[in-house]
Amino acid sequence: MQHNEEADGYDVVVLGSGAAGLCAALSAARSGARVGVFEKGELLGGTTCLSSAVAWLPNNRYAREAGIADSREGALAYLESLSHGMILPELAEAFVDTVPELLDWLDTTPLKMRLVAGYPDYHPERPGGMPEGGRSLEPELFSFIDLGRWEDKLVGVPRRMTVAETPIGGGTGHLPSEVQEQRERDRVEGLGRGMVAALLQGCLDEGVAVHTGERGVRLIQDESGRVTGVRFEGRGGLHDVRAEHGVVLATGGFEWDERLRRDFLRGPLAHPATVPTCTGDGLRMAMRVGAQLGNMREAWWAPVAVLPGQRANGAQAVQLVHRERTAPHSIMVNRHGRRFTNEATNYNALGGAFHHLDAHDFDYPNQPCWLIFDADHVEKYGAFGAAPGTEVPEWVVRADTLADLARRIEVPADALESTVAHWNEDVHRGHDSEYHRGESVYDGFVGDKDKYPGVESTLGPVARRPFHAVQIHSSTLGTKGGPRTDADGAVLDVDDRVIPGLFAAGNVMAAPTGMVYGGAGGTLGPALVFGYRAGRAAARTAGSPSEPDGILMEPTSV
């Protein structure tokens, strides 16, 4: 494909190449705009490539076709029940109301979605919640064959399956050898890289120019305050690119910038589970032109374990801790050797437990946190990459007694022994008397639901030696704060007025769902919706005839 590298720039300039950015670019191009996508990293796709690519999109037709009853009213009631006053109604309504239109539009692009059957909302017992699932969708498998030189320019490694084929989606996580070999020949992938590849293919088909190694450093404005371009830092140095109609920020969050984390987030965060390019570039650019900020204390919280000696995507490798804390025969304890939460709750809700501040000691008592599990857990479910019944990695702490394990992880032995004894008594009674683990439909979904349909899907005694421990860190899938926008993603200033020519979508914007993680895909659902809306709105915005500041140079491209 031939890139549109016109010296006078583009109608719409998009910063970032994750789901939000590529959806915005494709939407703008489909609306008739000349579009350029500029990615900070050398590879495309950002954190979307590392994800499962599940998108939480309520009131969708796939659920209705499967006989699942959902409604606009139910989805809005659900979000409101979790809002704590942090969700702006007009944004929630725009999100829910755009879902049918978005999915019809995606059907005309290379990205095709389908239902992840049975995946419940993360708070299914709340008003409007869906315990039977129906709101989480995933992309169909997509072939990379037609991507040409872009085929090997995506973040991450090939993953040739769908969520439905993994244990969380009801599958085994293993493909028959002949299926795996056929998918390798066809060069098809699912999950995050599959979603990015499909959106990228759509952009290339529409003539969108794609550039890597380009970090946005400043927005360019004319005398009236309209955003008319972007100053980039690339391999050739600083250069300016005109945006006749608008600029869409889709640069991700600020979780990799230590100072921004310190200044804005509500509690400690370590080892982000995202690409290291998420350092708040878009946030800083928006702040410089007077953007109003919102939701700055929040992130898409998630517990992780550090994988010693391993690196991924240019950073310390981590693993999201999901099944290990939800399957039977495991609990989590704080530095005092006490349980402090329902371990099987959704990963975002765990953030609140990690960030509890003790008013007397004025510290965070639940950090560090340790996952404690026994030999039965390892035998039945495996742990941290080890298959069921095999040896766990060498870095996992283990001991033949709880007292010795406590000594090794530096928690009080008497407290740990007492905690485990109380837990085992509760398991015998079939009820977690402290934190109600297993009572929500969601709790058991990631547990051993096939063998144990009730609370036993996540309850199991910690009794068989050897005992194991792994430190768990409060991490994130991205931050949720940034410039406030209207329903079309247009960025607002501190006086609630639109900053002409500036739009935002994805994790760089103030999340339209506030502190809520509605269900699986709670990040990518709004990213797709507001990327779609922002790209379309940017393409339809009248440009300014005035020249941007600085010297216009042809952007660097690979």
Model regions and ranges:
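Conserved N-terminal glycine-rich FAD pyrophosphate-binding loop of Rossmann-like flavoproteins
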Residues: 41-67, 77
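Glycine-rich loop(s) and the adjacent beta-strand/alpha-helix scaffold that form part
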Residues: 184-193, 205, 234-310, 358, ...
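Helix-rich C-terminal "cap"/substrate-channel and partner-interaction subdomain
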Residues: 360-466, 534-537, 541, 548-558
